[in-house]
């Protein structure tokens, strides 16, 4: 049996947007609350998701979820609700996360996100939805992150 400490990644995703709405605070404040919680719990890394709705889904893609729980009728509208951060915001979260002694990463869902995250993330995490997207995986792999 290996005697090593597990590396614990706190998956922030885009969940903080709902928390921000519920608490009437900015998404950036909510994301920092999540980072604080992860740090206090002893996590090693805070992981986010970076995308723009325009780059990952058609504006006409219908909802595939239970509309009684999430009334948003298109995938585009749902993703648009959670894509408000820009490079400056992610940089602020990166610095905040590092100041807490944790690694920072964000799953890029498009080439532009992969590019602007390059000097921020400690490593890339590929989304399961992109596992068959070999050109995108190769593009990220060429960046040489370990």
Where are the predicted features?
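N-terminal small/glycine-rich loop or linker at the start of catalytic domains
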Residues: 1-22, 65, 72, 76
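Active-site-adjacent beta->alpha loops and helix N-cap segments on the catalytic face
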Residues: 6, 86-90, 113-116, 126-144
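Hydrophobic faces of well-ordered beta-strands that scaffold small-molecule active sites
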Residues: 8-12, 46-48, 104-107, 124-126
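Conserved, mostly hydrophobic/aromatic
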Residues: 11, 38, 117
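Glycine-rich, proline-tolerant flexible connector loops at the mouths of alpha/beta enzymes
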Residues: 16, 44-84
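Short, acidic/polar
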Residues: 24-38, 108-114
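Catalytic domains of carbohydrate-active enzymes, especially glycoside hydrolases
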Residues: 30-51, 120
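Catalytic beta/alpha-barrel core
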Residues: 79-86, 102-110, 123-133, 146
